[in-house]
Amino acid sequence: MQQTSDGVNNSRELPKSIIIPPIRGEMAKLRPATCDDLQRMDELCAFDKASVITGKDSQSERAMVHAWVERSVQWSHDGFSDSKLSELCRFAGDVQSRPTIAWAIVPDMLDDVENTFGAIIGMIFLIDIDGWSRSARIQVVLGKDYRGRGYSRDAMPRVMTYGFASEPAGLGLHRIWVGVPATNTRSLSVYQSLGFMKTGTARDVLWDAQNQKYQDFVVMDTLVDEYDAIRSLDAFGLHVIEENPGVVEALSAHEHSVAIPVRRDNLDDAWPYNTSTAEGTSSKRAWWRIIGRGRKRNVNTEGKQ
């Protein structure tokens, strides 16, 4: 692994194989997805109205999810051969061949009943993982009856924390991005609250079969030095779970490790997952408006950025 003096990973290569960590949320836990979970996704009608949510038709969305899970299983079980890994790095522009990590979302409660059988309600992915640019796309696919209940808000910042954490705690990503139809205002609002910034719009690249018209595709992203794991959770009144992968590194990198003990005395005793969490109070400040102000940028001789 090649690193700079400040500890940044300069390697442009992905590992041959990976151990996908479980991740704990407040509403659900995330475990590595398996091919056996795919039938459940059909039962959940997880691909219903896909054109409205992701801009793809249901069959295309289903095929992509199957491919993502299969690639995730391969990377975490058999791994990639030297020749395959070299090909992935050399032809990073081929998004269809890039590695993927897939988690199944397992809620604590299922329809107000304890989920003793571990039934899943959807999946969350890091896809298009590009070792050369240290970039990945995040995607959530939920069952029809479990959308809009807060599962994406609970899972996404925790997966992003793992993605941005330096290796070996995380993937050492530099950029995480999302893509969504311009008409999906609910998702756009969630992504903005997580700190994503709109970086571009591809006009009329998606076909809305339901309304029989073209629609725009909005790209949003956030960078490792912009993303704040603590504030992204606080924006939704969620707790930090320090046992999750990448959290300790995130606290250290963003200088929250000192603030956490100060606030510890005021924690709700009912919170069971760790003893060093931040309070679950909603953020009152639109913090995403100030992200990136402290980033280092090149300055020309006239002092203009």
Tell where the protein language model's regions lie, with residue ranges:
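Short glycine/proline-centered loop/turn elements that form peptide/ligand docking sites
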Residues: 184-187, 204-206
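GNAT-family acyltransferases
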Residues: 1-145, 213-305
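Loop/helix-junction capping segments adjacent to catalytic residues or to phosphate/diphosphate-binding pockets
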Residues: 62, 149, 185
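Glycine-/small-residue-rich active-site loops that bind phosphorylated ligands and cofactors
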Residues: 143, 147-148, 183
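Conserved GNAT acetyl-CoA-binding A-motif
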Residues: 165-179
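Conserved acetyl-CoA-binding loop-helix of GNAT-fold acetyltransferases
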Residues: 148-165, 189-193
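Conserved catalytic-core motifs of GNAT/GCN5-like acyltransferases
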Residues: 177-179, 192-213
